[in-house]
Amino acid sequence: MSLKEKTQSLFANAFGYPATHTIQAPGRVNLIGEHTDYNDGFVLPCAIDYQTVISCAPRDDRKVRVMAADYENQLDEFSLNAPIVAHENYQWANYVRGVVKHLQLRNNSFGGVDMVISGNVPQGAGLSSSASLEVAVGTVLQQLYHLPLDGAQIALNGQEAENQFVGCNCGIMDQLISALGKKDHALLIDCRSLGTKAVSMPKGVAVVIINSNFKRTLVGSEYNTRREQCETGARFFQQPALRDVTIEEFNAVAHELDPIVAKRVRHILTENARTVEAASALEQGDLKRMDELMAESHASMRDDFEITVPQIDTLVEIVKAVIGDKGGVRMTGGGFGGCIVALIPEELVPAVQQAVAEQYEAKTGIKETFYVCKPSQGAGQC
């Protein structure tokens, strides 16, 4: 049974009438451009065919009822007439409440709604299950009440909800790609202007995501430290963000910087350049150049930004040994565990899967999870 069928059936059973709309919003993977988003830089993600699906209908009052199919059909109810506050027990409900509250704060006028939510974006894998939920809820209200919002505004609203209501600091990339993703394309995003450019993906190439299943422990504290180091670097150059510093300017005075800060700055500057070049390489179907850029990105994250762990490096090495220069592979996400992403010719996917199955657990004691994805369409009706 598809997520659409599942949520429609649950909706009818729970609420006693049929849903009028079904909306989906996808998760994402970032192909290249790591930790560049909060430095006003470039990222190159694609939406994936794992998504959050919501069957819904408008109500003729001011009540919101939300059922979470993946959390034992837990039900949350709240009124649009009262101040929206955090739910004491259901963390999932706060993503919904946050999006609704921030849409209200943006002076959008809408009535009540019934929703049933289900999703298959793996949680805790760095594939943006939370952003996909936020964008799905925003799209539900936009579609049901014809709100004058475009995808970028729905994305910004979701980011605001996560930062201010849920209390998790995140950049804009995750929500933006979920809202604006394009089938068979990646999206080059300028995180300063929020401008986007669709980049066609080469035919016959699979997007493979492998979760190391190494439990991330340092990610919060180390993430904040990296941010501070980048801000220190930008201040040294008297610029608003590292986006505004050239590699030539950096090389001329690198020796004057604190050695750790210098390494962090070098990663951001070179990663930004790699990301813009990767968009061109991908569009031209130049997998050999993509391989080089992804390898350089991984080495930079390992040696300059210092956010990889041995388990991730092992996974990258296993995949690289199989694909050679026919595709690219690197760590993706915040670091200290999580996933790797690989662009692999479809005919090599079984060999990669076999090599990883045979070697990764033997070397690390951890079993990986393997996902083969297609670049998918952003949020909308399904």
UniProtKB/Swiss-Prot annotation:
GO terms for molecular function: ATP binding; galactokinase activity; magnesium ion binding. One of its GO terms (cellular component) is cytosol. Disulfide bonds: none annotated. The record marks R28 as: Transition state stabilizer. Substrate binds at E34, H35, T36, D37, Y223. It is found in: Cytoplasm. It catalyses: alpha-D-galactose + ATP = alpha-D-galactose 1-phosphate + ADP + H(+). It holds the Pfam family GHMP_kinases_C. Its EC number is 2.7.1.6. GO terms for biological process: galactose metabolic process. The active site is at D174. Pathway: Carbohydrate metabolism; galactose metabolism. Mg(2+) binds at S130, E162. ATP binds at G124, A125, G126, L127, S128, S129, S130. Keywords: ATP-binding, Carbohydrate metabolism, Cytoplasm, Galactose metabolism, Kinase, Magnesium, Metal-binding, Nucleotide-binding, Transferase. Belongs to the GHMP kinase family. GalK subfamily. Catalyzes the transfer of the gamma-phosphate of ATP to D-galactose to form alpha-D-galactose-1-phosphate (Gal-1-P). This is Galactokinase. The gene is galK.
